[in-house]
Amino acid sequence: ASCKCDDDGPDVRSATFTGTVDFAYCNAGWEKCLAVYTPVASCCRKKK
């Protein structure tokens, strides 16, 4: 599932969701892109 990163923009309707939901921790080579912490899942994307 996709998720909204912090820099995707504040407007949920027009923002592009560039992140991917990952369980607990992001995969190697990925970074958490959402400041809000949830114990169940993180919003991650590939490191540039």
Swiss-Prot record:
Disulfide bonds join C3-C43, C5-C33, C26-C44. Binds to site 3 of voltage-gated sodium channels and inhibits the inactivation process. Gene3D superfamilies: Anthopleurin-A (2.20.20.10). The keyword Zinc does not apply. SUPFAM superfamilies: Defensin-like. One of its GO terms (molecular function) is sodium channel regulator activity. It comes from the Eukaryota. It comes from Radianthus crispa. This is Delta-stichotoxin-Hcr1e. A synonymy between H.magnifica and R.crispa is controversial. Coiled coil: none annotated. Transmembrane segments: none annotated. GO terms for cellular component: extracellular region; nematocyst. Keywords: Disulfide bond, Ion channel impairing toxin, Nematocyst, Neurotoxin, Secreted, Toxin, Voltage-gated sodium channel impairing toxin. Belongs to the sea anemone sodium channel inhibitory toxin family. Type II subfamily. It is found in: Secreted; Nematocyst. GO terms for biological process: regulation of signal transduction.
